[in-house]
């Protein structure tokens, strides 16, 4: 059985206005992850991912590329332990 991994991923580049959040949420749901994704006012996209370690790592790899119109220039991952854990995967408002 895989260990549950919880991380916060911050993605910079051309990641807003290109469908990044919606595509991210679709991929996270397909991988059975819990968490959220949101735009930040500084132009980045931030996501909290929780789930089996192999699935979280696969999601992080996807986030390095993103959808076709995105251009990721930097991806930063930090441990995250956010409570309460959402029941599924949500697109949240900009912060």
Swiss-Prot record:
One of its GO terms (molecular function) is acylphosphatase activity. InterPro entries: Acylphosphatase (IPR020456), Acylphosphatase-like_dom (IPR001792), Acylphosphatase-like_dom_sf (IPR036046), Acylphosphatase_CS (IPR017968). It catalyses: an acyl phosphate + H2O = a carboxylate + phosphate + H(+). Residues 6-93 form the Acylphosphatase-like domain. The keyword Hydrolase applies. Its EC number is 3.6.1.7. Keywords: Hydrolase. Signal peptide: none annotated. The active site is at 21, 39. PANTHER family: ACYLPHOSPHATASE (PTHR47268:SF4). Belongs to the acylphosphatase family. This is Acylphosphatase 2. It comes from Ralstonia nicotianae (strain ATCC BAA-1114 / GMI1000) (Ralstonia solanacearum). The lineage of its organism: Bacteria, Pseudomonadati, Pseudomonadota, Betaproteobacteria, Burkholderiales.
